[in-house]
């Protein structure tokens, strides 16, 4: 497509005015709700980590200077992929960022945070979203905790 002269030959077509107005309204709504959402995510991430600490979970990254809707933890001696495979029918978590899920290399972010290469393979990343409920969060905590305990039992029996 080639733009018209009035668009300096860059963009063809008329501007999507309803889309522009809708986007503006979406930004307005998100700005109003952002503070409450951020607070909720911080509380929920804290809840998850407190429970995971009880079963040996270690936080990857800074405890406060972080995105509140992402929690990255590891459980020493338990491969992240083993955890993911064990819970994949019930919950969606990953071993790295969304853009590197198919990459088998250690996470460059975790390496930059000072983790050694071996430990990066134990990491799991849990992302929260606006539509998640407290019931789902409790289910996630219980499922991952039970999985960790089962994997620890299996590895001690080998």
Q: Model regions: which residues?
A:
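Conserved C-terminal alpha-helix-loop-beta "cap" of PLP-dependent enzymes
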Residues: 71-124
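A general structural signal for well-ordered alpha-helical segments in protein cores
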Residues: 17-20, 27, 45, 68, ...
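A short beta-alpha structural unit
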Residues: 60-76, 129
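Conserved core segment of the aminotransferase class I/II
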Residues: 1-38
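Hydrophobic C-terminal alpha-helix "anchor/cap" residues
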Residues: 52-53, 87
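Thr-Gly-centered strand-to-loop micro-motif
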Residues: 10, 61-62, 93-96, 127
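Structural signature of PLP-dependent enzymes
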Residues: 27-49, 56-67
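PLP-dependent enzyme catalytic core of the Aspartate aminotransferase-like
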Residues: 106-158
């Amino acid at each position: 497509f080639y733009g018209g002269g009035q668009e300096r030959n860059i963009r063809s077509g008329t501007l999507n005015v309803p889309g522009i107005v809708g986007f503006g309204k979406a930004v307005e709504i998100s700005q109003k709700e952002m503070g409450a959402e951020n607070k909720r995510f911080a509380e929920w991430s804290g809840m998850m980590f407190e429970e995971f600490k009880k079963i040996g979970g270690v936080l990857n990254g800074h405890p406060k200077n972080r995105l509140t809707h992402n929690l990255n933890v590891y459980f020493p001696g338990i491969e992240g992929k083993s955890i993911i495979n064990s819970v994949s029918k019930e919950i969606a978590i990953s071993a790295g960022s969304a853009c590197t899920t198919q990459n088998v290399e250690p996470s460059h972010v975790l390496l930059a945070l000072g983790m050694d290469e071996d430990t990066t393979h134990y990491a799991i990343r849990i992302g929260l979203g606006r539509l998640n409920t407290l019931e789902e969060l409790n289910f996630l905590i219980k499922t991952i905790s039970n999985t960790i305990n089962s994997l620890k039992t299996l590895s001690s029996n080998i």
